[in-house]
Amino acid sequence: DSGNIIVTSIDGTSANLEIRKDAHSDFYQWFHFRVSGARGQRITLRITNCGGSAYPGGWDNYKARFSDDREDWRCADTSYEDGVLTITHTPALDSIWFAYFAPFSIERHHDLVQRTAACPDVELIELGQSIEGQPIDCLRIGNGPTQVWLYARQHPGESMAEWWMEGALELLTDPVSETARILREKCTLHIIP
């Protein structure tokens, strides 16, 4: 549900790629794609348009993520030079995934919202829909006077923020956490995961 790459050329075990622009935007930064049929072969993936991305300074010392099962993500050998991000890897299996950061699937997102909304004293409000027709949900937790807004994934490439949000929601809805109890008493939290 979050694939994003353009293959511009393939030569043996090397490929030149480009990151596709975000929908209805001139910006781009994130990628997520699968490579098949390269088990045991050292592959070189060159993303050639990184120099024109939304935040080219973010590629210095950056490491792409890879996974053989889409559950466990590790850092790939990655370098950035002259606007080109180069990923080199030798897959152990026939199918391997690469991503900007560990993806947070839309199914996992919906599960998180549903699980949190089922907790006591949590109100689910649908604020609207995304341009893809997905609900934009807000989870209201607590009843204190201080209004706190937390939101994740404002931009397409920000999947890492929802991993943080998952942990925050687990803490904030924990019935035995003293920290969560105090926050719920002092604040009304409006959370858009």
Where are these regions (language model features)?
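M14 metallocarboxypeptidase catalytic domain recognition
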Residues: D1-P193
